[in-house]
Regions:
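Short beta-strand/loop motif that positions the catalytic acidic residue
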Residues: 311, 318-320
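Carbohydrate-active catalytic/glycan-binding domains of CAZyme proteins
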Residues: 380-951
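C-terminal catalytic histidine-bearing segment of alpha/beta-hydrolase fold enzymes
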Residues: 337, 343-379
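Short beta-strand element of the alpha/beta-hydrolase
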Residues: 70, 82-94
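N-terminal cap/lid segment of alpha/beta-hydrolase-fold proteins
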Residues: 33-82
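Mobile cap/lid helix-loop segments that gate and shape the active-site cleft of serine hydrolases
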Residues: 202-218, 227-231, 267-308, 313, ...
Length: 951
């Protein structure tokens, strides 16, 4: 018996590498492919890519040349300057021969005899419905930015024979569809007899193909391998393909082809093999349909898992269903173990995974395939949200290689926190633009716009500077900013729904910002955005708050001075969205390729979508289009944000998702332009409305390390970390960051006479929830003022929202007590409820040495000693599933007296669990406070040595 050239090479290679179980092996040569000489036969434009029906050359009988037809899918962005990664997609066997490439690609109707009603089109649809959850995987990959090639293997599709095609058509037509089969004169019995006879001839035909090839020193598997290598050669010849990043994917028989191709073709960078890996003894039990995959002489030398000696160290992913009846798990596990043996020196390059399901490529498996190919052909991926914390209404600008973001801060200060990134995924806090919040001078000549009936200029109905320092203005203040870089300076424009529109600017976003400049006094103006257009004009768009203005769902524009400090005319309505875009708001104003665009969310914060308005004139009229919606994804909303263009010409959109107790977390979406409209996210169905991505390739930007907004604080600096915010404009009397001691001291702040609960405390020092699950631990030392006759000082750790829970230390006539307190519906003035209480000991502080200088000429008064109580506090937050896509959040508390032994807070015989709620337009926060409730000209204090967050 003569061996094929491939098997001879394999055997020689095995002999040369005898005894080796891992490392680098000689890969046998399989010959050079002919010039592909591609011809384009037909073209169809599809959403985001082009489908070409092509013909190219492979090696035929006796070294002759054979022309093979294929589908070539090309993303719209592909060009000689923007080269895209490529994937060769290899179809399965399936005992279905009438289609091959059409098992992966939606057929091009123009080349089918009967168009979209053709038998091939129906067969293709039937196959993807059965095996791919209705998805043409090649088309999906093209929409994700891959050049994709899919060709027929020998004996499939356009390379099959009439008997095989007819048998496939009859065999896969069910009783209802039988009338659609090519021979409609057959009744059911005749159909069965015909199928049986055809089946025999089809299998005889497969054996004949194998024998004919073997007689020429070629086995069928080698023929397919050579054809697949020729397909790779075609991809390499295309000027818009990134030839360093070509991968392969195959399902079932296609997986066999994939790992053979990856082993013997250096031009394939990585491979994904789905549902074809087993042991020889299992393969021997399978049917005669395996002629196309049989490598008979090799069985005396190696098992299938030994292909790993030729694959390693090439990146490979092997997947198999837990309940795959063709490839039972116990056999596949043996093969996977052998593969891993050969990858022992490069273990990270091989992944073997089992998934729930059988011999099937469902959508979850498809996502794993795309993730793996992206990781190896496009680079690493990011996961949304990129900032899993409450940065509401984010906006972004680029300056050089850096990206800057700010967001709403409402009543929390320092406000307008500034974040910076170099890759749009890893962000760090660098500063804040608002440290104080003076309002506009209501008596000056600043223009007054009245939207609310009955509102007079001398009665602004807005909290003044005093109220902003003494009472938390929950949900008021700093709404939906826009950040821009213009003429060498950073500008932030922001709307206060009760006072008007203001602007702050700086040349250094990490440094000090100028005091606010108020452009207009108004009741209800929100969400402003400036634009300096290409004609040298400046504009300001904004929305309005129905709660203040008495109307919503309308957008405005006003001309602005070139320096951005004042409006040149009153605002006018340019768009009314009541009928089609209700609750439209959050304007972001841009000029792009000669047109004006307003990006605005509509439909509500947690339930809406992204709308874009387009016009040739700033004043309109504006066309409208929904460009991103939830579309069944886990990202509800998706809400307000801004888009950015990178230096390399990529477009990205940052927006928030309302996650209830966790606040409004930040997502990064890919964006592209199609026919003058942006498409945000991934548009799988081609309707122009994108779906938010949860995982996607990293932007084409330099990676400078993993970064995230700060959270833990050791209090070793003379100022608070940038993550901290107060519930109101802070007083310098509230705290002292003592770097010499490495601690933060909070003084007990006198609360107002009408104080009801912590919702009324302006001196809460808090930060955002940093993740869905995290643990906060802090060491608190409490020193109440012994001079206070009414013992009422308290300090503690709080998880704060419209309801809150706090573990705290309280001074009382009986001494210091540790209490667990909750307040449900604190925003409605509800009283606190104690759920746990116990006494704790105190240590007297030494008498200060300075006492020796006190006068003794008057009757001496012995000073009351200060005492200190130290307790470790801990809060553990976790997400819990509930109906819908946004999890609920719960928190438990514990305490320790030595930092080692921890005691859970117990209430009613079980561990206390608090159901976390968001605040007013914000997520829940966690932090510290120190209060007193009776007047005195001095205070006690608490000290925190550190505040540590772990995930």
């Amino acid at each position: 018996m003569r061996l094929s050239l491939l098997i001879l090479a394999l055997c020689c290679s095995l002999a040369a590498n005898a005894g080796k179980t891992s490392g680098t092996y000689h890969v046998p040569e399989v010959g050079k492919s002919p010039d592909p000489e591609m011809t384009v036969l037909s073209v169809e434009d599809r959403d985001g890519y082009e489908c070409r029906y092509v013909e190219f050359t492979v090696e035929g009988k006796r070294r002759s040349r054979e022309r093979v037809r294929a589908y070539l899918l090309i993303p719209d962005q592909a060009s000689e300057t923007v080269k895209c990664p490529a994937v060769l997609m290899l179809h399965d066997h399936g005992a279905r021969f009438d289609i091959g490439k059409e098992k992966l690609v939606r057929p091009l109707a123009a080349v089918l005899p009967h168009g979209s009603d053709d038998h091939i089109a129906r067969s293709s649809r039937q196959w993807v419905d059965k095996n791919f959850d209705g998805v043409w995987l090649a088309d999906s990959m093209a929409r994700q930015g891959y050049v994709v090639l899919a060709a027929d293997a020998l004996y499939w599709g356009e390379r099959s024979n009439p008997e095989a095609q007819r048998w496939s058509e009859l065999n896969y037509a069910d009783k209802e569809d039988f009338s659609e089969a090519s021979d409609r004169t057959l009744d059911v019995r005749a159909r069965k007899d015909t199928i049986k006879a055809l089946k025999t001839r089809v299998y005889e035909g497969q054996r004949k193909v194998y024998d004919d090839l073997f007689a020429r020193d070629v086995i069928w598997a080698e023929k397919m391998l050579r054809d697949d290598i020729a397909s790779v050669g075609l991809l390499k010849s295309l000027p818009y393909v990134d030839t360093e990043n070509i991968g392969a994917f195959g399902f079932s028989m296609g997986a066999h082809r994939c790992w053979m191709l990856a082993a013997f073709c250096d031009d394939v960078k990585c491979g994904v093999a789905l549902s074809w890996m087993t042991t020889l003894d299992r393969e021997a039990e399978m049917s005669a349909s395996d002629y196309s995959m049989a490598v008979m002489p090799m069985r005396e030398q190696m098992d299938f898992g030994d292909i790993g000696m030729f694959l390693a160290p090439k990146p490979m992913l092997f997947l198999n269903g837990e309940t795959d009846h063709l490839f039972p798990k116990e056999k596949v596990e043996v093969a996977f173990e052998k593969l891993h043996d050969h990858y022992s020196e490069n273990p990270g390059q091989l992944k073997t995974l089992f998934f729930d399901g059988g011999h099937h490529c469902g959508k979850q498996v498809q996502a794993s395939i795309a993730d793996y190919l992206d990781e190896n052909l496009k680079g690493p991926k990011y996961t949304n949200p990129v900032i899993n914390a409450d940065y509401s209404d984010p906006d972004i600008c680029r300056v050089g290689d850096d990206y800057y973001m700010t967001s709403s801060s409402f009543n929390h200060f320092p406000g307008l926190q500034i974040l910076r990134s170099t890759d749009l995924v890893n962000w760090e806090l660098i500063g804040a633009a608002l440290t104080d919040y003076p309002g506009p001078d209501w008596d000056d000549s600043l223009p007054w716009d009245v939207l609310s009936p009955g509102l007079e200029p001398d009665e602004p109905e807005a909290p003044g500077a005093h109220e902003w320092r003494t009472v938390p203005q929950h949900g008021c203040g700093v709404w939906a900013p826009a950040i821009r870089y213009h003429d060498g300076e950073f500008y932030i424009y922001c709307g206060d729904p009760d006072r008007g529109v203001f602007m702050v600017k700086t040349k250094d976003p990490a440094g000090k910002w100028d005091d606010p400049v108020w452009l207009v006094k108004a009741k209800g103006y929100i969400d402003p955005c400036p634009l300096w257009d290409s004609q040298g004009r400046a504009w300001l768009t904004h929305g309005c708050a129905g709660s203040r203005a008495g109307v919503k769902s309308v957008l405005f524009i006003a001309p602005m001075s070139e320096d951005g400090t004042r409006l040149l005319d009153r605002s006018r309505i340019i768009y009314d969205g009541h009928r089609t875009q209700p609750t439209i708001e959050g304007t972001k104003f841009y000029e792009y390729e000669g047109r004006y665009y307003i990006f605005s969310p509509a439909g509500g914060v947690s339930t809406g979508w992204q709308t874009v308005l387009r016009s040739d004139n700033p004043y309109g009229p504006y066309d409208e289009k929904v460009v991103m919606a939830q579309n069944g994804s886990p990202v509800n909303g998706p809400h307000q944000g801004g888009w950015i263009e990178t230096a390399s010409g990529e477009f990205w959109f940052m927006h928030f998702q309302d996650k209830d107790a966790y606040g409004r977390v930040v997502h990064l979406q890919p964006m592209k332009w199609n026919d003058g409209w942006p498409v945000i996210g991934e548009d799988e169905d081609g309707d122009g409305v994108g779906t938010p991505v949860t995982r996607y390739r990293m932007p084409d930007l330099p990676f400078t390390g993993v970064k995230r907004p700060a959270d833990s604080d050791e209090f070793e600096k003379p100022s608070l970390g940038l993550q901290w915010q107060w519930a109101a404009v802070p007083s310098p009397y509230w705290s002292h960051a003592d770097a010499s001691k490495g601690c933060l001291r909070l003084y007990s702040v006198q609360q107002s006479d009408d104080w009801k609960n912590l919702w009324d405390s302006p001196n809460l020092l808090m930060q955002k929830f940093p993740e869905d699950r995290f643990t906060v631990t802090t060491r608190i030392s409490f020193t109440p003022n012994p001079q206070l006759k009414q013992k009422s000082e308290a300090c503690g750790l709080v998880v704060m929202g419209e309801s809150y829970a706090t573990l705290r230390l309280e001074d009382s006539p009986e001494g210091i007590r540790l209490k667990m307190v909750e307040c449900i519906d604190a925003d409605n003035g509800s009283p606190e409820r104690v759920v746990f209480s116990r006494a704790v000991g105190s240590e007297p502080l030494p008498v200060p040495a300075s006492n020796v200088y006190m006068s003794t000429t008057v009757p001496p008064v012995a000073p009351l000693p200060y005492v200190e109580t130290t307790v470790y506090f801990r809060a553990q937050v976790k997400d819990v599933p509930r109906e819908g896509n946004v999890p609920a959040s719960v928190c438990t508390f514990s305490y320790s007296f030595d930092g080692n032994t921890w005691h859970k807070v117990i209430s009613d015989g079980q561990e206390y669990e608090f159901k976390v709620r968001p605040g007013r337009w914000i997520g829940a926060k966690v932090g510290l406070y120190c209060n007193r409730y009776h007047s005195k000209n001095d205070s006690g204090w608490m000290e925190s040595d550190w505040f540590r967050i772990s995930y």
